């Protein structure tokens, strides 16, 4: 069980600032909204009640980690100090918590909802929410506003509301998305332009929001597994691996070595699959049609392996609590061993046809620069963070599976531009092949599934587990009250930090470069919207 330190809201901002400056807690790993219910006279002294937030912090300098929580018993006008001035990652995460729970973050410059319509009534993640009563079916479009509100605390203890302008009437604003092939999903960017130069950008999420975290609260633990494949659908193995590990950790279940080997191999095949698709989509975004077909051709080989063993190509439903659903198909190992030298031998053609192309280099080099400090502050992990010089690989920071038994290099570039983000992923394909090669001939015998009770009840407590997804750290925060359903199940999206940084990355760039920058960030919209 995870130890979480409680801090009163009045002291939260000062304590968080101290942790950032004195303890070097520069990485806000996760921020989770909570509803712990109404306070009761019979509650034990250590029981937290009310609406609140759980923060997971990490120091990129010392590796130290800490979890903090705070809460307020005011359910009518819940207020907590914002930490968005300390960590940029808190910007979108606090908007998500406001959307879900109605907690207003004092000092946050943009208190709009993140996923739901701004005219939505109520807050769906509250335990007392009644959606049928509050929200009749609407047949009209949501109005778009160019202003937002900020609530500040005055020295005398009173609150002051001010209006912040997103775009004024003199600005030339264009919409890119939500129905645009280059946004890689239903993502909407409102972009203010001066000629072809981007002045600022407003990202609008929620067009494919399905309420997955809310649905989890009414599902048994085995039922929750199916929804992880629908988040980042290009990282289904990795997503479900994280959730299974979190539940197994909470229940004290140790899976067999065979299962660990299988899960690790599947995760790395998934990474290659995702990076090949990344290559193809980026090439298409820049008009390189020939390169587009290279990635799709070779990715099909991996999807065929998945289909033969797992039964699915994108939605695999393979990992399960205590193991995997089925053993490896007899053809799996021979096909993998054939694929490794094939891709190694042909990857130079990818570079010949696209990487070395003068147009591709001009569109990517020196464009869309994200500094290391901003990457950490926004929480941009994965290839984006490592392209900016931040060694943030979960497989190295917090080894899981059998990553502690293999030798692999963490790919890190320092330029922070679109080309560096591209090269990180291309180099990671080779490292994933190396990892698989070290494991494929050494898979031990053993059970593929531990014996489980018919009804799974996770011990009471709070738990956090993470894996290195294809786009960065995918985390799972679970709070259990000992029931057969989770009290709270929150996913740390790999894509939300990426899209929150788009405004910072794109300012001063050309409008055409927005497409290339989005392609190299490699976000998946259903993972953001959940």
Swiss-Prot record:
It is found in: Cell inner membrane. Its main location: membrane. The keyword Secreted does not apply. Disulfide bonds: none annotated. One of its GO terms (molecular function) is NAD binding. Residues 171-530 are annotated as: NADH dehydrogenase I subunit D. Its EC number is 7.1.1.-. GO terms for cellular component: NADH dehydrogenase complex; plasma membrane. Residues 1-144 are annotated as: NADH dehydrogenase I subunit C. Keywords: Cell inner membrane, Cell membrane, Membrane, Multifunctional enzyme, NAD, Quinone, Translocase, Transport. It catalyses: a quinone + NADH + 5 H(+)(in) = a quinol + NAD(+) + 4 H(+)(out). InterPro entries: NADH_Q_OxRdtase_suD (IPR001135), NADH_quin_OxRdtase_su_C/D-like (IPR037232), NADH_UbQ_OxRdtase_30kDa_su (IPR001268), NADH_UbQ_OxRdtase_CS (IPR020396), NDH-1_subunit_CD (IPR026662), NDH1_su_D/H (IPR022885), NiFe-Hase_large (IPR029014). It is a peripheral membrane protein. It comes from the Bacteria. In the N-terminal section; belongs to the complex I 30 kDa subunit family. In the C-terminal section; belongs to the complex I 49 kDa subunit family. NDH-1 is composed of 13 different subunits. Subunits NuoB, CD, E, F, and G constitute the peripheral sector of the complex. NDH-1 shuttles electrons from NADH, via FMN and iron-sulfur (Fe-S) centers, to quinones in the respiratory chain. The immediate electron acceptor for the enzyme in this species is believed to be a menaquinone. Couples the redox reaction to proton translocation (for every two electrons transferred, four hydrogen ions are translocated across the cytoplasmic membrane), and thus conserves the redox energy in a proton gradient. PANTHER family: NADH DEHYDROGENASE [UBIQUINONE] IRON-SULFUR PROTEIN 2, MITOCHONDRIAL, NADH-UBIQUINONE OXIDOREDUCTASE 49 KDA SUBUNIT. This is NADH-quinone oxidoreductase subunit C/D.
């Amino acid at each position: 069980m995870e130890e979480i330190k409680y801090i009163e809201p009045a002291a939260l901002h000062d304590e968080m600032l101290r942790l950032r400056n004195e303890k070097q807690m520069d990485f806000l790993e996760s921020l989770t909204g909570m509803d712990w219910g109404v306070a009761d006279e019979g509650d034990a002294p250590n029981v937290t009640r009310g609406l609140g937030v759980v923060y997971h912090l990490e120091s990129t300098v010392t590796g130290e980690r800490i979890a903090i929580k705070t809460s307020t018993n005011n359910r009518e006008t819940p207020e907590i100090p914002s930490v968005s001035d300390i960590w940029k990652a808190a910007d979108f995460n606090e908007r998500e918590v406001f959307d879900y729970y109605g907690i207003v973050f004092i000092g946050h410059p943009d208190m709009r909802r993140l996923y739901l319509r701004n005219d939505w009534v109520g807050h769906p993640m509250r335990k007392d929410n009644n959606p049928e009563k509050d929200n009749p079916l609407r047949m009209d479009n949501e109005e778009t506003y160019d202003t937002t509100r900020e609530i500040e605390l005055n020295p005398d203890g009173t609150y002051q509301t001010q209006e912040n302008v997103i775009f004024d009437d003199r600005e030339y604003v264009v919409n890119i998305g939500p129905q645009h092939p280059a946004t890689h999903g239903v993502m909407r960017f409102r972009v203010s332009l001066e000629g072809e130069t981007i002045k600022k950008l407003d990202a609008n999420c929620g067009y494919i929001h399905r309420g997955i975290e809310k649905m989890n609260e009414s599902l048994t633990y085995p039922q929750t597994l199916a929804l992880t494949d629908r988040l980042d659908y290009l990282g289904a193995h990795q997503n479900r691996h994280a959730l299974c590990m979190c539940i197994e950790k909470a229940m004290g279940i140790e899976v067999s070595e065979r299962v660990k080997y299988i899960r690790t191999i599947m995760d790395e095949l998934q990474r290659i699959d995702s990076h090949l698709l990344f290559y193809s989509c980026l090439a298409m975004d820049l008009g390189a049609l020939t390169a587009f077909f290279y990635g799709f051709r070779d990715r099909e080989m991996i999807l065929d392996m998945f289909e033969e063993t797992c039964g699915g190509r994108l939605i695999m439903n393979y990992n399960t609590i205590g193991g995997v659903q089925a053993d490896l198909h007899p053809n799996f190992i021979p096909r993998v061993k054939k694929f490794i030298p094939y891709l190694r031998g042909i990857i130079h053609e990818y570079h010949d046809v696209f990487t070395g192309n003068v147009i591709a280099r001009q569109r990517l080099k020196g464009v869309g620069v994200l500094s290391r400090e901003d990457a950490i502050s926004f929480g941009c992990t994965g290839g984006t963070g490592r392209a900016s010089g931040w060694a943030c690989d979960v497989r190295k920071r917090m080894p899981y599976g059998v990553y502690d038994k293999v030798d692999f290099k963490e790919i890190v570039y320092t330029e922070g531009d679109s080309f560096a983000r591209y090269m990180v992923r291309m180099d990671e394909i080779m490292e994933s092949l190396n990892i698989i090669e070290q494991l494929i001939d050494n898979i031990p015998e053993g059970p593929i599934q531990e014996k489980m009770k018919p009804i799974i009840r996770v011990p009471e407590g709070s738990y956090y587990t993470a894996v290195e997804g294809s786009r960065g750290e995918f985390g799972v925060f679970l709070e259990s009250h000992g029931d057969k359903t989770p009290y709270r199940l929150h996913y740390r999206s790999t894509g939300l930090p990426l899209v929150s940084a788009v405004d910072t990355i794109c300012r001063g760039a050309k409008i055409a470069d927005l497409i290339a920058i989005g392609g190299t960030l490699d976000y998946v919209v259903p993972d953001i919207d959940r």
